[in-house]
Amino acid sequence: MLRVGPLTIGTLDDWAPSTGSTVSWRPSAVAHTKASQAPISDVPVSYMQAQHIRGYCEQKAKGLDYSRLMVVSCQQPGQCDIRAANYVINAHLRRHDTYRSWFQYNGNGQIIRRTIQDPADIEFVPVHHGELTLPQIREIVQNTPDPLQWGCFRFGIVQGCDHFTFFASVDHVHVDAMIVGVTLMEFHLMYAALVGGHAPLELPPAGSYDDFCRRQHTFSSTLTVESPQVRAWTKFAEGTNGSFPDFPLPLGDPSKPSDADIVTVMMLDEEQTAQFESVCTAAGARFIGGVLACCGLAEHELTGTTTYYGLTPRDTRRTPADAMTQGWFTGLIPITVPIAGSAFGDAARAAQTSFDSGVKLAEVPYDRVVELSSTLTMPRPNFPVVNFLDAGAAPLSVLLTAELTGTNIGVYSDGRYSYQLSIYVIRVEQGTAVAVMFPDNPIARESVARYLATLKSVFQRVAESGQQQNVA
């Protein structure tokens, strides 16, 4: 588990709200019937949604689990006003068009979208569970339906003595990391207005995830093997055996079922973080460039690799309306950094250049590149993705605003392990930490511990050197 300021990041086993009377929200019988009768939609499934649904179905067919839920929570003072919470939850669901869709998957890989036509047909109703234990509360969250069912999202509150905990559990098919800002801010602001005796808060208009799916489909259909973006992705993948890169150390047998575990190590304290940023700036890079350079230098120390190939996510929202929209907009940027014989400054500049020049590649789904290629393959299990979270940038900055001070925000995975090894580099005022979510087995635990120790050594040597000497 990782705790930074008011934010906790971990798995569902780390979530520990004060136990008490619990209320969850789920679809009414009428809404469920309406959804089951929803017509087939001509809105294309986004590449991110398709990848997630296929991944879930393929892993399930192998007898393996698949991490699919994004769980967020926050605390509110006092006794929960269930009527107000009910209004806010239903307003949220009707506001965002992604919640109107559900999906069907057939054996040949085709995915069909069905969409509720009238958002007013969506109705979630409170279910009063009474006093529950912590394992029972977690079970409610864990049992959120899978992405092939409408209503693969659940909401609820757990009442404590002087406060209550609000939670949302949403399948990844409908959300990305901005769930922490969109969902929690909407609940917090709208609920506060209602219990304060005010009229329902008028939020800025949300955008349309359906529109994004159409734009992505139109754009992707124009791509060919000769498109510069496709050629860039192809060159990257050819450097990593025709697919995404592998983690530098063994992680156990990916064909064996595994839960997820998370380990966190503080890389730099507040002073060292400032020193590290100064070294990055002197090298002509930003903090993210320095982070990616350190990842590359750590891999060089562990394996002797001469070139670092990495992946880092990027939100592709571009407009104010997009920023208010629930959905999966996040793509991946491929990073290539020559490492052998490089001083940190050289590596940081190269990483920054690769990041900046690759930003637009996040709008090009790798799955589309594979469709166009005769040589590339889909990602292998346990490919690593480096997530950089900065207190000064979204989505983390949204959670550190004055409005959410004291709300004890939590962001959790469902404790299942899927296909991707997630590395989180988190920079806050107090310092810089790295958390790794990995398959919970002895081989992976040993490898992740070794990786984090090496990465910390690189970070600290850079910060303490105060110059761009070779730290590899």
UniProtKB/Swiss-Prot annotation:
SUPFAM superfamilies recorded: CoA-dependent acyltransferases (SSF52777)
Example of a GO biological process term: trehalose metabolic process
UniProt keyword annotations, A-Z: Acyltransferase, Transferase
Family affiliation: Belongs to the PapA acyltransferase family.
A Pfam match: Condensation
Protein name: Acyltransferase PapA3
Keyword hit for Acyltransferase: yes
Group of enzyme by EC: transferase
Spans traversing the lipid bilayer: none
Gene Ontology CC annotations of this record: membrane
GO molecular function: palmitoyltransferase activity
Lineage, broadest ranks: Bacteria, Bacillati, Actinomycetota, Actinomycetes, Mycobacteriales
Disruption phenotype annotation: Deletion of the gene prevents PAT synthesis.
InterPro entries named among the record's database cross-references: CAT-like_dom_sf, Condensatn
EC numbers on record: 2.3.1.278, 2.3.1.279
Purpose of the protein: Involved in the biosynthesis of polyacyltrehalose (PAT), a pentaacylated, trehalose-based glycolipid that could have a role in anchoring the bacterial capsule. Catalyzes the sequential transfer of two palmitoyl groups onto a single glucose residue of trehalose generating the diacylated product 2,3-diacyltrehalose (trehalose dipalmitate). Although palmitoyl-CoA (PCoA) seems to be the physiological acyl donor, PapA3 can also use docosanoyl (22-carbon saturated fatty acid) coenzyme A as acyl donor.
Reaction(s) catalysed by this chain's protein: a long-chain fatty acyl-CoA + alpha,alpha-trehalose = a 2-O-(long-chain fatty acyl)-alpha,alpha-trehalose + CoA; a mycolipenoyl-CoA + a 2-O-(long-chain fatty acyl)-alpha,alpha-trehalose = a 2-O-(long-chain fatty acyl)-3-O-mycolipenoyl-trehalose + CoA; alpha,alpha-trehalose + hexadecanoyl-CoA = 2-O-hexadecanoyl-alpha,alpha-trehalose + CoA; 2-O-hexadecanoyl-alpha,alpha-trehalose + hexadecanoyl-CoA = 2-O,3-O-dihexadecanoyl-alpha,alpha-trehalose + CoA
